[in-house]
Amino acid sequence: MIALSDSTLHRLPAAVAVPRYDRHALKVGVVHIGVGNFHRTQEALYIDEALHLPGNESFGICGVGLTDGAAARAKAAAYKVQDGLYTVTEFAPDGIARTRVIGAMIDYLHGPADPEAVLARLTHPDTRIVTLTITEGGYNIDETTGVFTLTAPEVAHDLAGGEPRTVFGYVVKALARRRAAGLAAFAVASCDNLRGNGDTARNAFVSFARARGPDLANWIDREVDFPNSMVDRIAPQVSDAERAKLNASSGVDDRLPAMAETFNQWVVEDRFRYGRPALEAVGVTFRDDVAAFVAVKGRMINASHMHMAYPSILRGERIVHEAMRDPRIVRLISTFLSRDVIPYVEPPTGVSVANYETMIVERFSNPAIGDQLLRVGGDGASKLPIFHSKTIATLIAAGADLSREAFLLACFARYLLGRDDNGSDFPVFEPVLTAADWEQIRDEPAGVLRAAPFTSLGLADHASFRRAFDRVTETLAQYGASKALDDVLAET
């Protein structure tokens, strides 16, 4: 295999597509914070395609990592060795794979190692866009009040001055420097999977800045664009075994290969007053009604992902496409969509949801992706309210059947125990649940309905929901998820 770097691009196997533009002629115009697999296979891929078109040379990417630890340092070192290059292998449902090298990231900075370098890059006049993938729960917004939490330890540290540690500290400090130097601001574009991600980002950064002083906060609120967007692509984690397999298949020795499905969608508001690459020429959709796209995607695709994940994990499954081999899971998704979502959702103008069910099942069933159920189910306390609150509220208002949503939350409560029906333990990743939340959850399964992320749903005291929830909870405890799944399907 050939080690990946700028100097070896011309020697890579012919089947591997490589950048055809001059990477040395690029300037950094985009700083991306949180360089995970999703960014590398979505935004960075679109920008890579745009860089092949004339006039976009000013929009190379500088990646930034803010987490510390051995893995984060190893990632930074690998990007340096590989000159920011990495491979993406896209797998179609029929198994056909295509590998390409992404050259859009021309620099990578590790904040804990050199905070000033990150600030200098953010402050540089060439930087016109800062994009984010910091996870749905990374905006430090209280789920119940919608207020930015100033007392979070790392936030409090950054507000006290000194070298920043949080994304809020870095971005706001850089904007303060730009303002003091008479430079224009930049756009801050969230690419995280939540409704109103731009509005959420505005709330977070302006609130942080307001704690420093009203003048800076007002300037940021006025001068920084925060476009809303909808992003959609499945890009699973790559294990060591999968890394070896990807590299053996491509013939490229890549320390950081990424993989994804062929489906890719990015819908974004065109609010980039300081300039942007011509992304519309490479498949990105610019629309004013992003919220409608987010609603359809969240309530149908992301919500279905969660319906599939928790009962499957409890039954001992760990891989998404293997869980989809159970026709009951396919039927659960189909029934959820046809009865609980499609009759009530309003799709964007010109968009039909008629084929969504088939598309969702096909995407989830892609055997080449090997997506992890624990990844899909992780951080459920953040994701479930985001993707299911509107559906639950709509069903309650319509006096409709709540059995499938009760089944989902009962399975989630059981999942939080960290043990499946076979007696095997699994890790539970729920960073937004507090000690008080966990205390309620350990007292009884229904405690999850009173946990802070779920209180706004009002389900703990909703009689018909509680009857269904308690019934599923009892079945899960006595007979397991397979019987509970049979029961909820028998009710439809």
Enumerate the language-model features and the residues they cover.
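Substrate/ligand-engaging "lid" and interaction regions
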Residues: M1-T492
